[in-house]
A protein has these predicted regions:
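A transmembrane-helix-recognition feature enriched in membrane-embedded lipid enzymes
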Residues: 1-28, 59, 75-84
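Short, basic, glycine/proline-bearing loop/turn elements
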Residues: 14, 83-88, 116-119
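Short, flexible loop segments at the rims of nucleotide/cofactor-binding pockets, characterized by
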Residues: 14-20, 42-43, 88-92, 123-124
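Glycine-rich, highly charged phosphate/nucleotide-binding loops
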Residues: 20-24, 93-98
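A secondary-structure boundary/capping signal
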Residues: 25, 42, 67-68, 85, ...
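Short amphipathic alpha-helix with an adjacent loop that forms part of the alpha/beta core around
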Residues: 28-33, 103-104
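Catalytic core of membrane glycerolipid acyltransferases/transacylases, capturing the structured
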Residues: 32-93
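Non-catalytic C-terminal accessory region of glycerolipid acyltransferases
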Residues: 97-235, 240-243, 248-268
Length: 268
């Protein structure tokens, strides 16, 4: 318990250096922090979701958080998680022992933080809600506080220095989480899940960050067109030179055939 109070302020300071937090609906949380048992049921997006919610709850009584047993395999991580109130739970085998322990702690007025989806969602949308949170709340006679954690990044996921909005909704009274008719237990659990889902969706609809504008594409810088190679001009077609009429040469005068006259026959 002493280590919890030593580590919690240190983690609070470090987290507020690396991220920007905004808490809405803190009055709903305070309305159940009066020694009564209560369960915080939150959506789950990032591994650090429980840490962020824990430092904003900042209760003088330690908040218990069920966490999958794989996270405790690393000795240092397991020690830190244990100091911060995490309790190992075997999700695949129906760990009734841990559920009973959490129920007893909740009955004593200790808050329990549960992620009803049972795992993180990659899309940011609510997954299928499991029954563990409702079983603990019903057995402990606890009120249930819906909690929505919203990341103000373009993809809705956690990034360094992004804005984080944690919204606490109006508590669901313990009386509405009791199953009086065991023959209709499944129908009663379905009704509770639908009620919680509607509350969580409404918290998102009323407190979502405005959509960030898509990054404008810079206009492409037009490269100067390469100078076109000069096109060799085709030689002009050679016009045929008109034939000059060749003047006819005057025909040479025909020489008169000179027929040698026979000499006069000599007179006999």
């Amino acid at each position: 318990m002493l280590l919890y109070w030593i580590l919690l302020p240190i983690v609070w300071v470090l987290a507020h250096i690396l991220w920007r937090f905004e808490v809405i609906g803190r009055e709903h949380l305070k309305s159940v922090q009066d020694g009564r048992p209560y369960v915080i049921a939150a959506n789950h997006i990032a591994n650090l979701d429980p840490v962020f919610i824990l430092i904003e709850v900042f209760s003088w009584r330690r908040l218990y958080i069920p966490a999958k047993e794989e996270l405790f395999k690393n000795p240092l991580a397991g020690w830190f998680l244990h100091c911060m109130g995490a309790v190992s739970i075997d999700r695949g085998k129906g760990d009734t022992v841990t559920l009973e322990r959490l129920t007893e702690e909740c009955k004593n007025g200790t808050g329990v933080l549960i992620f009803p989806e049972g795992t993180r969602t990659k899309t940011g949308k609510l997954g299928v809600l499991k029954s563990g949170a409702f079983v603990i709340a019903g057995a402990a006679g606890a009120d249930m506080v819906p909690c929505r954690i919203i990341y103000g990044s373009k993809d809705g996921k956690m990034h360094l220095f992004c804005k984080i909005r944690i919204v606490f909704g109006e508590p669901i009274p313990a009386a509405e989480l009791q199953v009086t008719d065991t023959t209709h237990k499944i129908a009663a659990l379905r009704r509770m899940k639908n009620r919680l889902r509607d509350d969580l969706e409404q918290l998102l609809a009323e407190n979502a960050f405005p959509a960030l504008p898509a990054a404008e594409e810079k206009p492409a810088i037009e490269q100067p067109a390469a100078p076109e190679a000069p096109v060799a001009e085709e030689p002009a077609a050679v016009q045929p030179v008109p034939e000059q009429p060749v003047p006819e040469q005057p025909a040479a005068p025909e020489q008169q055939e000179t027929t040698a006259l026979p000499e006069r026959e000599e007179k006999l």
